[in-house]
């Protein structure tokens, strides 16, 4: 699902109009077969023009260019070949294109072909093709990707262009080192003694005099009901002591389920470190014990050799989370992530007390979970690659290229892997909420079931259409934001509900086999394209039969049926905000309002719109009775770039989300955060007391269009995930409760300094030592002052090193300890404790 490429309201309309304009007219070719003994090697380069070169081909666009060079010994013929590539942001042919034509194939897949008059490209020759992109293409992650060649005499074979380069981006309007320096100026590093003892900030704590010293392995004492948590505690202590049982008379780590007086919620805990009594961890439940152990882990030495012992500060922590739901949405449909990658994410979530993995398993570009009885869902829907027909795979997307072996384009979780993920999460007291997208964003399922129907029909099976999701007679014309025209399940077909029932029953069975009962299923509900269903005979017949008058009625009918399926399996229903929201006209403006149809059904909606007229949408839905998970795009979408830069990957459709953006999020108050101008909030609705009770919690969101390597997953998540954990667990900070901005500002500055100091001095060093995570290391800020260069960093504790000749610094380069007075091209980079560098910044001091 990418409701996210095009922002809401006015900006969304503008972006959609650009996208529509970028669709090229389909061109048909009659090409004679060309026999080629060997494919000529080629080099492809894509380069974005400077903003000063604004094109007149399309408004709000920028020029670019493909440069195709024949690097082989044979000519590339004048006809009989096609260049395919993906481009999320859209592309059109530029002015004076020569004898080539460009068209969109499907979704983000485009192709470029020679037309009549094109001359062969001899060895060493270069073809230049002018292109036009929307001006939202501002970093390399959004550039064309995954190019490959196909020759007409071998139409099923896609040949990857390995020698593909994206030229460095122009730095027009990019965030500068000077701007970064100014943003970092307010950060005042704090000593550890002034920071909370554990992360996220606990509800309350008391530091006492003295220490508890463990010179030998302590005894872990726990009742049988906490056996799993006791085993986790033993494993946590293993690196610090020799193997074997605790010695007689050793100090104790005592675990107990007990009342947590004054602390509400099943995850509340009390951690008491006493020099005489040892460690006593009591909690309202086993989950609370797990959260307390996560805190205790942070108090252990970062690194220690066995038998060196452990010294713990005398301390009392009484803690409970602010929000019961603290989630992360991980998209593995657009680009697949391995089981090992998911387990690593669960480890991170457990460390920082997040308790829900919203697992986005299906979308237009992939179906990632094995469903017994429907093998086509993975045999077709889990594979991407080049093919003339969608008989055994989906088309390339997001740079996956022609090869079905690409591990990010293709892949799924077999039954055993999914069960292992569930059990791994459950052991860490993390609930997995799988998402099966419907009725939109369902192309992988729609195509897979069409392949199944054709196969069974050819075999003479009378029930070939048992799970068909598309009406064969449907003449509806629509286009999703991702440019698909065939991605919607049809609510007029009984087979659609048979499919949903089958999938839901199998998901329930998978969870039961894991010993982790499924409680909630997320059923999508976002971005059904305008025009879908409108010319479907099956839908028209259903509407006549059920006395439905509008497409909104058809929507409600669909989700009433879906809700009944989930109810039959005793499941709670969750979905994106669109499931329960409607657009209505009020006076001279439109606004998103709560539909009364499902408001008393116990459904939970994930609300992502929080800008451009939707600042109060979460309030309206919660006030109406819907459960609400706050997942605001402009604050908690981790697929967005941190700021404008040609070096920072990520989407920009909802703005930019840096570490401080997440930290600054104020739950319950998107209206105040959005604007101080009363004209902008005049029609906005506040959160009622009843509505407040319907807010379930917060969720960070990572869609994966740009995540096609393991390091990118870490880079996009961390350290922003830490700010999410702080905001979801920690008490409401003082600065959010101060209505006077002049008084709130210094409180906020102090809280921000404390947060970055804690993650820089305590959290990340432990992560460096214990859990290899390639988190984003921010580039330093730089400023020229009195002939020298000053440098600063967003995260205290990282070391800064510099060069004076423009070369990339290493950890062996001089360390920044004050103003850099050398004359030259100054380049500075930050390094973690393992000597890993972040992106460098440079400033000319000549």
What are these regions (language model features)?
Residues 37, 221, 743-846:
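Short, compositionally stereotyped local motifs that mark structural "simplifiers"
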Residues 38, 143, 148-324, 574-583, ...:
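Acidic, contiguous N-terminal accessory segments
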Residues 38-59:
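Low-complexity, acidic Ser/Thr/Pro/Gly-rich terminal tails and inter-domain linkers that flank the onset
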Residues 67-73:
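Asparagine-centered strand-capping/turn motif at beta-strand->loop junctions
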Residues 73-106:
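Short acidic, flexible loop segments centered on an aromatic residue
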Residues 268, 272-512, 516-520, 699:
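Feature activates predominantly on carbohydrate-active enzymes
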Residues 480-602, 613:
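Active-site neighborhood of glycoside hydrolase catalytic domains
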Residues 572-785:
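Flexible, acidic glycine-rich loops studded with aromatic residues
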């Amino acid at each position: 699902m990418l409701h996210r490429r095009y922002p809401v309201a006015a900006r969304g309309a503008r972006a959609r109009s650009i996208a529509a304009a970028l669709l090229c007219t389909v061109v048909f070719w009659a090409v004679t077969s060309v026999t080629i003994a060997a494919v000529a090697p080629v080099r492809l380069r894509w380069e974005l023009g400077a903003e000063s070169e604004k094109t007149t081909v399309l408004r709000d666009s920028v020029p670019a260019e493909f440069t195709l060079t024949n690097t082989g010994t044979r000519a590339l013929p004048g006809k009989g070949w096609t260049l395919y590539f993906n481009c999320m942001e859209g592309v059109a042919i530029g002015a004076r294109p020569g004898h080539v034509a460009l068209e969109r194939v499907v979704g983000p897949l485009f192709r470029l072909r020679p037309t009549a008059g094109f001359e062969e490209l001899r060895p060493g020759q270069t073809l230049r093709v002018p292109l036009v992109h929307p001006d939202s293409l501002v970093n390399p992650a959004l550039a064309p990707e995954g190019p490959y060649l196909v020759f007409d005499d071998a139409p099923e074979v896609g040949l990857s262009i390995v020698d593909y380069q994206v030229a460095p981006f122009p730095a027009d309007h990019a965030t500068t080192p000077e701007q970064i320096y100014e943003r970092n100026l307010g950060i005042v590093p704090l000593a550890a003694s002034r920071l909370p003892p554990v992360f996220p900030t606990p509800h309350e704590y008391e530091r006492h005099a003295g220490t508890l010293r463990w010179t030998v392995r302590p005894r872990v004492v726990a009742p049988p009901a906490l056996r799993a948590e006791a085993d986790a505690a033993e494993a946590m202590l293993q690196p610090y002591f020799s193997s074997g049982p605790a010695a007689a008379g050793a100090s104790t780590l005592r675990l107990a389920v007990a009342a947590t007086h004054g602390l509400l919620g099943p995850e509340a805990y009390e951690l008491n470190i006493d020099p005489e009594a040892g460690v006593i961890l009591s909690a309202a439940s086993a989950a609370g014990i797990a959260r307390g152990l996560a805190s205790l882990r942070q108090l252990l030495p970062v690194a220690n050799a066995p038998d060196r012992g452990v010294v713990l500060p005398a301390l009392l922590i009484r803690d409970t989370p602010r929000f019961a739901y603290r989630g992360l949405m991980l998209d593995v449909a657009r680009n697949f992530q391995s089981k090992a990658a998911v387990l690593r994410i669960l480890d991170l979530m457990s460390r920082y007390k997040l308790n829900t993995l919203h697992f986005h398993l299906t979308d237009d570009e992939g179906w990632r979970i094995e469903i017994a009885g429907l093998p086509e869902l993975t045999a077709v829907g889990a594979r991407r690659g080049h093919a003339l027909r969608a008989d055994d795979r989906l088309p390339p997307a997001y740079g996956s290229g022609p090869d079905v072996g690409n591990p990010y384009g293709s892949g799924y979780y077999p039954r055993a892997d999914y069960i292992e993920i569930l059990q791994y999460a459950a052991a860490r007291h993390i609930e997995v909420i799988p998402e099966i997208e419907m009725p939109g964003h369902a192309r992988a399922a729609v195509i897979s079931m069409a392949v199944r129907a054709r196969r069974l029909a050819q075999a003479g099976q009378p029930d070939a259409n048992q799970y068909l999701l598309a009406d064969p007679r449907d003449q509806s014309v629509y286009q999703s934001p991702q440019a698909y025209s065939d991605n919607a399940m049809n609510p007029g077909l009984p087979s659609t509900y048979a499919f949903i029932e089958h999938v839901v029953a199998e998901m329930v069975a998978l969870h039961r086999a894991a010993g982790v009962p499924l409680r909630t299923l997320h059923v999508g509900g976002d971005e059904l394209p305008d025009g879908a269903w409108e010319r479907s005979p099956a839908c028209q017949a259903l509407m006549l039969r059920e006395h439905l008058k509008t497409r909104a009625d058809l929507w409600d009918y669909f989700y009433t049926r879906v809700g009944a399926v989930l109810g039959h399996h005793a499941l709670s229903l969750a979905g994106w905000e669109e499931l329960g929201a409607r657009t209505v006209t009020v006076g001279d403006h439109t606004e998103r309002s709560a539909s009364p149809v499902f408001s008393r059904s116990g459904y939970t909606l994930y609300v992502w719109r929080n800008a451009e007229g939707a600042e109060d949408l979460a309030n309206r839905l919660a006030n109406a009775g819907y459960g609400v998970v706050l997942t605001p795009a402009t604050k908690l979408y981790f697929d967005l770039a941190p700021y404008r830069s040609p070096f920072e990957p990520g989407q920009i459709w909802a703005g930019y989300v840096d570490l401080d953006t997440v930290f600054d999020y104020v739950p319950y108050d998107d209206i105040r955060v959005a604007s101080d101008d009363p004209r902008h909030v005049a029609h906005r609705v506040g959160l009622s007391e009843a509505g407040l009770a319907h807010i379930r919690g917060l969720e960070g969101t990572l869609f994966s269009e740009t995540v096609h390597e393991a390091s990118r997953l870490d880079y996009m998540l961390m350290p922003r995930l830490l700010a999410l954990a702080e905001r979801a667990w920690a008490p409401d900070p003082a600065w959010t409760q101060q209505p006077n901005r002049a008084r709130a500002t210094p409180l906020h500055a102090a809280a921000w300094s404390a947060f970055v100091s804690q993650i820089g001095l305590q959290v990340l060093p432990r992560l460096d030592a214990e859990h290899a995570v390639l988190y984003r290391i921010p580039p330093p800020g730089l400023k020229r002052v009195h002939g020298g260069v000053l440098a600063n960093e967003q995260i205290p504790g990282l070391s800064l090193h510099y060069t004076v000749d423009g070369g990339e610094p290493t950890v062996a380069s001089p360390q920044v300890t004050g103003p850099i007075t050398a004359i030259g091209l100054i380049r500075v980079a930050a390094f973690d404790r393992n000597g890993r560098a972040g992106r460098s910044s440079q400033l000319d001091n000549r």
